[in-house]
A protein has these predicted regions:
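Non-catalytic accessory regions of SAM-dependent methyltransferases
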Residues: 1-48
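Flexible, glycine-/basic-rich loop-and-beta segments that form/coincide
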Residues: 275-279
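Conserved AdoMet
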Residues: 29-104
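Conserved SAM/SAH cofactor-binding pocket of Class I
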Residues: 93-194, 217
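Conserved beta-strand segments of alpha/beta enzyme cores
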Residues: 84, 137, 161-163, 254-257
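Conserved Class I SAM-dependent methyltransferase catalytic core
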Residues: 210-272
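Mobile active-site "lid"/loop adjacent to the S-adenosyl-L-methionine
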Residues: 185-214
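Active-site beta-alpha loop architecture of Rossmann-like, nucleotide-cofactor-dependent enzymes
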Residues: 72, 187, 239
């Protein structure tokens, strides 16, 4: 990569090292100080040479991406449900599959609902719901002070009113909610896939020997914090849907069901807190 490196050469170098074309384009746009919406600009200027400082920043960014660091950590931004969220290594990178959880919640919420997002991280779920439904009284909770700081910064920048609190799941809460929503840690402690996730916070990923410790805790605590007829919606692992549905049923939830992610895998499961009309 010595000499005058053109935009075309930079992209081809990244792709040759295993970086997906779209990610290579977004990474280069970041280095050039342009937005992710300017991919067409790259095509129109593919023979333009990078300045010396740009080449150095490109090399550094490419080394990080080839080394497995998630693109949002390098650029500092992640897109989720039409929102641009600030992210770094303090929080899990928002995944497109988690938008399934937001889609589902939006179909269930009554007028002016009270909703809580547990383990909010960057604030992705809470902010998406508040943005789509301004009438929602939105709460967001996380055990990590670092994660809460990032979520609060995102909320302030986006002008979205969220009530934040620090704590472990629903412990100590006295409010009741129309919906409890969470994308908790659900990877088993010894899962071999963790090797590919070393840049992300471990506490946001793993949950005991079977990956279900936090799911069990939330499902057990939720009935006391849900209004009659309120919903608990959870994201979980690709092979955990049946176990989560069983836990929901054992804990008295009705209308227990799952929703599929973008790959057609049962990725979210939930149930409704029984109301008087269900008895």
């Amino acid at each position: 990569m010595d000499g005058a490196l053109t935009i075309s050469q930079a992209l081809h170098s990244a792709i040759a090292q295993g970086v997906a074309r779209l990610e290579a384009q977004l990474l280069l746009l970041h280095v050039l100080g342009r937005t992710g919406q300017e991919r067409a600009w790259l095509l129109a200027h593919d023979d333009q040479a990078l300045a010396g400082t740009e080449q150095q920043r490109w090399r550094e960014a490419l080394v990080r991406r080839v080394g497995g660091e998630p693109l949002p950590y390098i650029t500092g931004w992640a897109a989720f449900y039409g929102l641009d969220l600030q992210v770094d290594a303090r929080v899990l990178c928002p995944r497109a599959d988690t938008e399934t959880l937001v889609d589902w919640a939006l179909t269930l919420l009554p007028s002016m609902p009270c909703v809580i997002d547990l383990g909010t991280g960057s604030g992705a779920i809470a902010l998406a719901l508040k943005h789509q439904r301004p009438d929602v009284h939105m709460h967001a909770r996380d055990l990590s002070a670092d994660a809460l700081a990032m979520a609060q910064a995102n909320a302030q920048r986006l002008g979205l009113d969220i009530a934040f609190s620090q704590g472990a799941w629903l412990e100590g809460l006295t409010e009741t909610f129309d919906a409890i929503i969470s994308n908790p840690p659900y990877i088993a402690d010894a899962d071999p896939h963790l090797a590919a996730l070393t840049h992300e916070p471990l506490q946001a990923l793993t949950s005991g020997a079977d990956g279900m410790n936090d799911l069990r805790a939330i499902i057990t605590q939720a009935p006391a914090c849900l209004k009659p007829g309120g919903w608990l919606l959870l994201e979980h692992g690709y092979d955990q849907a049946a176990a989560v549905r069983q836990l929901l049923q054992v804990n008295g939830f009705v209308d227990v069901q799952s929703r599929q992610d973008l790959a057609g895998i049962d990725r979210c499961s939930g149930g409704r807190c029984a109301a008087e009309t269900d008895r």
